[in-house]
């Protein structure tokens, strides 16, 4: 079988070229052309402009034989994780050939990929590299050969262009929206007739554009306490603080402004908003990735253990005088600590005498970072809230903050009574 993985939102002439190349390979081998079509959320973590059903029709009209829906990934995981999962699915389905478009010469793509494979790096491919995602697909396909003892053969065609300009699905969608949901003539030239017809039908039926559930999204952003927001995947402490400061939200673009203040780019902002909308927790992400790890699908530099190990290494090196960036770079080059990362440790509290009588051992301690950047917890005995900064050594405070800012490692706090007083037992993973 010949495979293509795509959004096709909508199918344009560049996509038609992809499908025709796949058709050419398939006809020589007597095989089918399968489109692994993203459903629910796009590969860039946004709601689709065109429905899955309409995009499926477009792909079939363009020459595909079958559509395989890919659902449940793109509102949860970054591309670094969705790519190995999708490639593994295709290999397991029996796909032997993969077709993609690239502006860079295929020999250069293979050369770039070989370097990352040799170093075992699949998530840190520089953004400056052209066709970065194609390089990632090729490298991960080679990595998964170790797991499946087979891999897909890649076929590259040039990226689709009209009059020397690359065809952009984003630009097509923008121009249709800005033209009051009428397809302008310059956009029609970029689309096959079948896509134009299906788009017009979908617009007439009121199915375009797709959108977020803003009622759910804004209510959660406006009302959830800080510790609950911090438990949502892909929100770090800075993002949560700026979200809290930016309340009350009435439109999505207001949330984007808050996320920009936390140095979130467009892709991470879309992913974070999708996680808030769908109430995706850190634990859900952690367990999902761990499940794929057990299947041998996740590259070693992306495992949850490696994320935790990196946090411990950086905290240890910062404690010895290195900067955070220096420690991260040394870790990337293979340096490690001799001791293992702690998955459980205790923190002290600052409690007032009148708060002590309401505390009970085993109570949940909800972690958060206050507006001054101080690590803290909130206890909820009956009828009151008890808030306290956490007492930690510098090394352990750095470790905890890095885990919080990992955006995916779940953290749990429990109140314990010890001889020296009350403590919070922190557990991760």
Residue ranges, per PLM feature:
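Short active-site-proximal "capping" loops at secondary-structure junctions
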Residues: 38-43, 73-75, 398
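OB-fold/S1-family single-stranded nucleic acid-binding modules
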Residues: 421-429
